[in-house]
C-alpha cells in the first residue's frame, strides 16, 4: 500500500509527506525511543484521543520524553482525518502517531479493513514475561523484534503465531484473533481490538479479552493484522476451519 501523500503535526498542521519534519538531533539522541501507536481511522468518526494519549504518555514518561498536551494530539488527529476525507472520501486508513521533538506527527496508509484472503497462523509457546523496559520499548519506534518475527513467520508461510500452551489459544504475537464460539464472539487481543472497535470496525457484542481460549470452542476465526486488516483464518497449526 502507498503511504498517504500528507502528514499532520501538532506544531505545523498539515504538510506534504515529503516535507522534513523531525530534527537531526531528535533522530540522533533518541533513536528507537519515540512513543508511538498505530490505529485504524474512519473519516467522520473521532478516535478516542484520551485513551491514545494515556497509552503514549506511559512510554514517554518511562523514557523521559516530553509529552505534548492532549489538545495537540486531538488537533493533529482531527486535521489528519479531515484531510483524509477531503482528499479520499470515506476511505479507511491505518494511522501511525509518533511523539518526537515534543510534537505529535501523524501519518497513514489506506487499508481495506475486511480482506478475503485466508491466512495460516503458526503455533508457538507463550513468550516469557517481559521486563517493564521491554514492554515500554514495544510502544516506541523500536520495532526490530517485531520486524524479525514478521520475517521469520513469512518465511514459513505464516502471517502470525498463536501461543498454545496448555492446549489453549493465546493472544497472537503480532495481531489479534476474533473467534466465533457457542457462547458468542470472543476477541483475543483487547488493546488492538479496542482500537478496531473505536473506529467502528468491530461490533460491540464481541467480548474482548487477553485470557486464553479453548480451541475446541472455536467454530470460526479471523485474524486482525498489525495494519488492522481482518482476514479469515484457514489454520492455526493443525487446527483448520
Where are these regions (language model features)?
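Glycine- and Gly-Pro-enriched alpha-helical subdomains that act as flexible
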Residues: 168-189
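Conserved alpha/beta cores of soluble small-molecule-handling proteins
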Residues: 1-162, 181-185, 192-241
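Short, composition-biased local secondary-structure segments
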Residues: 164-171, 224
Amino acid at each position: 500500500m502507498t503511504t498517504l501523500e500528507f502528514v499532520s503535526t501538532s506544531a505545523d498542521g498539515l504538510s506534504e509527506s515529503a516535507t522534513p519534519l523531525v530534527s537531526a538531533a531528535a533522530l540522533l539522541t533518541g533513536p528507537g525511543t519515540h512513543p508511538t501507536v498505530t490505529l485504524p481511522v474512519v473519516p467522520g468518526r473521532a478516535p478516542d484521543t484520551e485513551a491514545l494519549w494515556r497509552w503514549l504518555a506511559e512510554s514517554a514518561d518511562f523514557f523521559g520524553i516530553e509529552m505534548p498536551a492532549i489538545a495537540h494530539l486531538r488537533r493533529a488527529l482531527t486535521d489528519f482525518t479531515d484531510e483524509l476525507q477531503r482528499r479520499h472520501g470515506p476511505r479507511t486508513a491505518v494511522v501511525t502517531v509518533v511523539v518526537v521533538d515534543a510534537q505529535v506527527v501523524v501519518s497513514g496508509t489506506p487499508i481495506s479493513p475486511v480482506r478475503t484472503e485466508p491466512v495460516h497462523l503458526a503455533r508457538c509457546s507463550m513468550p516469557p514475561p517481559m521486563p517493564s523496559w521491554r514492554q515500554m520499548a514495544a510502544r516506541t519506534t523500536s520495532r526490530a523484534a517485531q520486524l524479525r518475527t514478521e520475517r521469520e513467520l513469512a518465511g514459513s508461510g505464516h502471517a502470525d503465531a498463536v501461543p498454545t500452551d496448555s492446549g489453549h489459544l493465546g493472544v497472537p504475537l503480532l495481531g489479534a484473533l476474533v473467534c466465533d464460539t457457542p457462547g458468542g464472539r470472543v476477541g483475543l487481543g483487547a488493546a488492538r481490538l479496542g482500537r478496531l472497535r473505536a473506529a467502528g470496525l468491530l461490533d460491540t457484542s464481541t467480548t474482548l479479552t487477553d485470557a486464553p481460549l479453548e480451541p475446541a470452542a472455536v467454530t470460526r476465526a479471523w485474524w486482525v493484522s498489525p495494519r488492522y486488516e481482518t482476514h479469515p483464518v484457514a489454520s492455526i497449526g493443525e487446527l483448520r476451519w
